[in-house]
Amino acid sequence: MSVQTTKRRLSPASIEALKGERPIVSLTAYTTPIARLLDPHVDFLLVGDSLGMVLYGLDTTVGVTLDMMIAHGQAVMRGSERCCVVVDLPFGAYQESKEQAFRSAARILKETGCSAVKLEGGAEMAETVEFLVSRGIPVLGHVGLMPQLVNTTGGYRSVGRNEKEVAKIRRDAKAIDDAGAFAIVVEGTVEPVAREITATLRAPTIGIGASPACDGQILVSDDMLGLFNDFKPRFVKHFAELAPTISKAAEAYANEVKARSFPGIEHTFQVKR
């Protein structure tokens, strides 16, 4: 009898258990090569619907489809082996009913092999989160600024600037926590409120434009790598400046091709004699 051993990935439960132990590290990934580079350094990779804007040039995430998320989820799973992988439920794939959410989430887990799904929403989505979790689908919540609601909110701006917004964030975070999410992304939320809910929730909070007190942090990898120079959100730090590096590499390549210095003989195949 042979024993087959496979490397165990971090699970949603292991991410949840990190609350109070150490900060949780997360980044987005959409492709196999990037997932392979990030995998050794993060606790979980999020295949975010931000790919619609980052990879496809869409103005918002609303146009992202379930098929797109599954295709990129498969790519990230192929490129990673140790971290937990979470895939976003895109707009229109879960809001209609908890049954629709289950069908979409189950399809993502079955077709990608990922460990969990993420969905945006507060108290109004708590029943859906509980429905999924009770049926074996781990859920990463998402409160605060919710990009999928851009058409009703009128744009992307931080939330928690008045008492009404603060009350809503508190209510949303508690509802998603009580529903059983293993962690909750807190996006674009004023720092004191993000700090407060982090201290009161069972589930770890993952901040993006929130607070250093959050239990973990996430950034869009392309932002972190400095691939976009035209717009830099306040909460983004460039840990590299790859945009000019890539541009210079393309320029050098173009110049060598035009000068016929590339390819050289060393880059060609010869007949063996």
Swiss-Prot record:
Keywords: Cytoplasm, Magnesium, Metal-binding, Pantothenate biosynthesis, Transferase. The active site is at 187 (proton acceptor). One of its GO terms (molecular function) is magnesium ion binding. The gene is panB. It is found in: Cytoplasm. Its cofactor is Mg(2+). Binds 1 Mg(2+) ion per subunit. GO terms for biological process: pantothenate biosynthetic process. Mg(2+) binds at residues 49, 88, 120. It is an enzyme of class 2 (transferase). Catalyzes the reversible reaction in which hydroxymethyl group from 5,10-methylenetetrahydrofolate is transferred onto alpha-ketoisovalerate to form ketopantoate. The keyword Magnesium applies. Belongs to the PanB family. Homodecamer; pentamer of dimers. Pathway: Cofactor biosynthesis; (R)-pantothenate biosynthesis; (R)-pantoate from 3-methyl-2-oxobutanoate: step 1/2. Its main location: cytoplasm. InterPro entries: Pantoate_hydroxy_MeTrfase (IPR003700), Pyrv/PenolPyrv_kinase-like_dom (IPR015813), Pyrv_kinase-like_dom_sf (IPR040442). 3-methyl-2-oxobutanoate binds at residues 49-50, 88, 118. GO terms for cellular component: cytoplasm. The keyword Hydrolase does not apply. It catalyses: 3-methyl-2-oxobutanoate + (6R)-5,10-methylene-5,6,7,8-tetrahydrofolate + H2O = 2-dehydropantoate + (6S)-5,6,7,8-tetrahydrofolate. Pfam families: Pantoate_transf (PF02548). This is 3-methyl-2-oxobutanoate hydroxymethyltransferase. Its EC number is 2.1.2.11.
